[in-house]
Design a protein with these regions (language model features):
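Extended ligand-binding clefts on enzyme/binding-domain cores
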Residues: 154-164, 431-437, 468-561
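Acidic/polar, glycine-enriched structural segments that form the non-catalytic walls/loops
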Residues: 1, 83-103, 107-305, 387
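Long, well-ordered core segments of solenoidal/helical folds
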Residues: 277-286, 325-348, 392-414, 474-494, ...
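Aromatic-rich carbohydrate-recognition surfaces in CAZymes
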Residues: 109-110, 306-410, 435, 439, ...
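Well-ordered alpha-helical scaffold segments within catalytic/enzyme domains
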Residues: 210, 252-266, 277-281, 315-327, ...
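C-terminal capping/lid segments that line or modulate ligand- or cofactor-binding pockets
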Residues: 1-44, 306, 317, 352-354, ...
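An extended acidic
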Residues: 1-83, 146-171, 243-265
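The feature captures the catalytic groove of carbohydrate-active enzymes
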Residues: 184-187, 203-226, 292-308, 349-371, ...
Length: 633
């Protein structure tokens, strides 16, 4: 795949997601869920004006671009102006709420003083593998790119004027495709539409539909023809209007913080609203699994891929869901996804596809398991729904059983458990953050038992069992706290350290303070640690990197997650001014559409790597809520 890493814009519904560059090029298209399956290797579009060569719509020296979402929606508009021919193009991309098809609507306006003959060309290639070869097929004025499992269909309500199934690349660049073949064994093919003459000041419109027939549900050609003909007859304007209404209503319904009624900066509102609009696109409709983000690197040229569900990430994100009253999505994550992915021994593996299947892993992280229990009680604190606790009690008890064995192994130095990776999946061993999550899980389980007893059908034996379990949890929680004080505080550095092997300063040292509350934010050792964090992790631009020497992705870029974590700490410690400074840093680093990245480019102060990371957006909403609770904005 010709990897393009930055998904500047995303559109979709519950089934389909598509991502775009800032110039409007579609670079990915998923059907089924946000993480699987991706179908498009590339999808190029261009125009031929009079006798010119192709003007590649999204990368031409004479083209200028602007892009925006229709306010408070997932309807994306890209404006393209070609200064040589003086053609203005408005491209609108959206997925209807009620139809599983991507709609690309174009308006071409001739701002020249002469007539212009325009042709519109599409050149696309679908992903394939050695066991599932692909072909191109033009039938019923439709380009059907297919293999055994799926077909990607490009069509319009206009007739195709020319086509080329094999060897189309060079001819496409010349803007002149053609060939006798209507079918061929090629993963890339091209079609064109003749828009004919456009007079000065006139406009012409063209609608392109991209329909994915996954698993060849319409396996007979006549069935597929019928479905395409049905889609062609759809009222595109009505579908767009309905999508706009749906998303605006969605934002209103989930504006639990009342942000849009407050006198706040437009950037804060944009990030907040974009978070609300992004979240439902990344949740699996059936399981509740939450994708970390739209994929950026299918070929793993720079990373191990992102579009999976990490249980720990999901816990942070569901807390943000609760901030914007997405309670149903939170409960589906725990009631369905977490139950179906828990191993028999009570643990959760490192990461999963959002449909619940195990994803590629390279170890396990003990905090994944502990975080789920913490998250379940965090959700209960918001809803006070004891049935939710009851429904998940067995799952929590299984996880606690695993964690107790892990802690016993750690304290007794038995060495029976495989070493756990840390929060960042890089260091294998015993880390302060990971152990603190177990403290948080035990503390949460004690509270779960206290709340759920009234709705359980229990006899004296069960009552005594719970009482004994609570006593064990209290004892182990205290032992964990003492262990952490004795193990992870370095007297030479006068600071907590992330582990005993490299003794580095790490932003995850904040975890035992916020949100896990093992230590007070004003404890002397904690304050010493904060001083050390500020000396080692704060960048010259004012953000924070994850840990000493963090050079992931080629540079010491600050992370919104790390910077917002510092804001969390300062809010707890009562240093509101520093909290607001950290919050402002992240606010100012957002993309023009309101997306937050995994990292921030120090020079450009824009998102760097994984634009629209759900964890970043979750931390932003959680921090914003805390700031508003203190009346700081």
């Amino acid at each position: 795949m010709r990897t393009k890493y930055f998904n500047d814009g995303v559109v979709g519904n519950k089934k389909i997601k598509a991502s775009f560059t800032k110039t409007g090029e579609m670079i990915r298209m998923f059907y089924g869920a946000a993480d699987y399956k991706q179908f498009v290797e590339f999808y190029h579009t261009g125009i031929k004006v009079n006798d010119s060569a192709l003007i590649y719509l999204h990368n031409d020296i004479n083209n200028s671009f602007s892009q925006e979402y229709i306010k408070d929606t997932n309807v994306l508009q890209t404006h393209i102006y070609n200064s040589y021919f003086r053609v203005r193009i408005t491209q609108t991309d959206f997925v209807p709420i009620s139809e599983n098809v991507l709609i690309k609507h174009y308006v071409f306006k001739n701002e020249n003083t002469i007539d212009l003959d325009l042709s519109f060309l599409v050149y696309s290639k679908i992903l394939r593998n050695l066991n599932n070869d692909t072909s191109g097929y033009v039938k019923n004025d439709t380009l059907i790119q297919y293999n055994h499992d799926f077909s990607v269909c490009t069509f319009s309500n206009e007739k195709i004027s020319s086509k080329q199934i094999n060897g189309a690349e060079n001819n496409f660049m010349q803007g002149s495709i053609g060939g006798k073949d209507y079918i061929g064994m090629s993963p890339d093919s091209s079609i064109s539409y003749n828009l004919k003459k456009i007079k000065p000041g006139e406009e012409k419109e063209l609608t392109i539909f991209v329909y994915i027939n996954k698993n060849r549900n319409k396996c007979m050609l006549n069935e597929l023809d019928d479905e395409i003909d049905r889609i062609r007859k759809l009222d595109v304007q009505n579908l767009k209007d309905n999508a706009v209404k749906y998303w605006r209503r969605y934002v209103r319904e989930h504006d639990t913080l009342g942000i849009n009624k407050k006198e706040l900066s437009s950037k804060i509102k944009k990030i907040y609203n974009r978070s609300i609009l992004l979240f439902p696109l990344l949740v699996h409709e059936k399981t509740g699994g939450i994708s970390a983000g739209i994929e950026v690197d299918e070929d793993k040229t720079k990373c191990g891929r992102y579009s999976y569900c990490w249980p720990r990430d999901g816990v942070f994100v569901t807390e943000a869901f609760d901030v914007v009253s997405m309670y149903e999505e939170t409960e589906k994550f725990y009631n369905t996804f977490c139950k179906m992915t828990q191993s028999k021994n009570g643990m959760w593996e490192q990461r999963f596809y959002t449909d619940g299947r195990l994803a590629p892993c390279w170890g396990y992280q003990i905090d994944e398991t502990a975080s789920v229990i913490f998250g379940i009680y965090a959700h209960y604190k918001i809803t006070k729904n004891k049935k939710f606790l009851k429904d998940n009690l067995k799952m929590c008890e299984n996880a606690i059983n695993f964690l107790e064995k892990y802690i016993d192994d750690l304290f007794e130095n038995k060495g029976k458990f495989q070493l756990s990776y840390d929060l960042w999946e890089e260091h294998e061993g015993t880390s302060f953050y990971s152990v603190a999550t177990i403290f948080a899980a035990f503390s949460a389980m004690i509270k779960i038992y206290a709340e759920v007893k009234s709705v359980l059908d229990i006899n004296k034996v069960k009552t005594d069992t719970i009482k004994k379990q609570v006593e064990n949890l209290e004892k182990n929680a205290q032992k964990i706290k003492e262990y952490c004080l004795n193990t992870f505080y370095d007297e030479e550095k006068k600071s907590f350290v992330r582990n005993l092997e490299d003794k580095k300063i790490d932003i995850s040292l904040l975890g035992p303070i916020v949100p896990f509350r093992m230590f007070s934010p004003n404890d002397k050792k904690v304050k010493n640690t904060i001083e050390r964090i500020n000396m080692t992790l704060r960048t010259y631009t004012g953000g924070y990197i994850r840990y000493e020497g963090d050079g992931y992705m080629g540079g010491y870029n600050p992370w919104p997650i790390a910077t917002l974590w510092m804001a969390w700490y300062y809010l707890e410690a009562g240093d509101d001014q520093k909290a607001l400074e950290n919050f402002a840093f992240v606010t100012n680093s957002a993309s023009g559409h309101g997306y937050l990245g995994e990292q921030v480019n120090n020079d450009a102060m824009k998102p760097s790597w994984v634009i629209g990371l759900t964890w970043s957006h979750a931390m932003y909403l959680l921090t914003l809520e805390k700031i508003l609770e203190k009346g700081l904005l």
